[in-house]
Amino acid sequence: MTCTIVVGGQWGDEGKGKIISYLCKKDNPSIIARGGVGPNAGHTVEVDGEKYGIRMVPTGFPNVNAKLAVGAGVLTDPEVLLKEIKMLEKFNVGERMIIDYRCGIIEDVHKETDKSNEHLSKEIGSTGTGCGPANVDRAMRTLKQGKDVESISKYLGDVSEEVNEALESGDNVLIEGTQGSLLSLFYGSYPYVTSKDTNAASFAADVGVGPTKIDEVVAVFKSYPTRVGEGPFPTEMTVEEAESLGVVEYGTVTGRRRRVGYFDHDLAKKVCRLNGATQIAITCLDKYDTDCYGIIEYDKLSEKGKAFIKEVEEKVGVKVTLISTGPELGQTIDVRK
């Protein structure tokens, strides 16, 4: 029995979807539970060459044997959820989905408020998905809960009970974090942050799991960190530099071009300390050095690639156990014992 949390180590878009999908296939958890803010965070999952952009359904959906859960702490947009369940019909998502009956519900008024608020949309760079305004209503105790919405009633359940029962039965459980640690309302570059905390402890609370039940925390870092929206970015490079390195990316939810920077070891160390990270996953090593593309054995990585991994381990103080060298699940180096 292992309970693992996957957390973003930067400003989101670290490639958590790829790492989560890999862990769900390799470790075969019986339940995959999503924590985080809500549908403001997008993940791209590639299965057999086909890409799926999702915002509500857990990223581990390709594992057709696992239950898929959205915790009570996660805001739910019924319209987005139902669209994704339909899009993922061939994965039998609808039969495996559990939405906690206590989750907060995003309505049209929240999305309209988010988009029309000049401070949020222009100064902060909000995604416009209604999460911030919905969390305001939640704090005021006026927000609807899942149990109040008929359209999703067939998917409702008690996620905390499901997860804890799975752990007590000796099953593996994977908790998906969203966005990134540096976007945390508490620990990020306020006010250029999201509307709640985005660290491992909060993700555990989102799905109703106590801290002593957590065995592993995997912090995911991209070789070239990126950021969407406003706010500080200490190692940011120019657009020209990013293009010369072939690093041009766009956000899954907003479609906005991502800002790109160099790896920041000091910030990575702070993030690992904040989350109690037990291991690190590095993604897009093939972007850092194209000679690493598709390599699946550590010893066959280029010297440049190995040096990058070694420097991360030495400066951050946490072992790198997973290395992504391409978009496919098979393009992963796994050095876990």
Swiss-Prot record:
Keywords in alphabetical order, please: Cytoplasm, GTP-binding, Ligase, Magnesium, Metal-binding, Nucleotide-binding, Purine biosynthesis
- Subcellular location per the Swiss-Prot or TrEMBL entry: Cytoplasm
Keyword flag Magnesium: yes
Q: Where does IMP bind?
A: 13-16, 40-43, 127, 141, 179, 194, 256
GO MF, one example? adenylosuccinate synthase activity
Its UniProt entry gives the catalysed reaction(s) as: IMP + L-aspartate + GTP = N(6)-(1,2-dicarboxyethyl)-AMP + GDP + phosphate + 2 H(+)
- How is the cofactor bound, as the UniProt entry phrases it? Binds 1 Mg(2+) ion per subunit.
Residue numbers annotated as active site: 13 (proton acceptor), 43 (proton donor)
InterPro entries named in the record: Adenylosuccin_syn_GTP-bd, Adenylosuccinate_synth_dom1, Adenylosuccinate_synth_dom3, Adenylosuccinate_synthetase, P-loop_NTPase
Please state the Enzyme Commission number of this protein: 6.3.4.4
- Pfam families associated with the record: Adenylsucc_synt (PF00709)
Q: Where does substrate bind?
A: 252-258
Q: Name one GO biological process term.
A: IMP metabolic process
Q: Which PROSITE patterns match?
A: ADENYLOSUCCIN_SYN_1
Which residues of this UniProt protein bind Mg(2+)? 13, 42
Organism domain of life: Archaea
- Cofactor(s) for this protein? Mg(2+)
Q: List, alphabetically, the NCBIfam families matched.
A: PRK04293.1
Q: How does it assemble?
A: Homodimer.
Protein name from the UniProt record = Adenylosuccinate synthetase
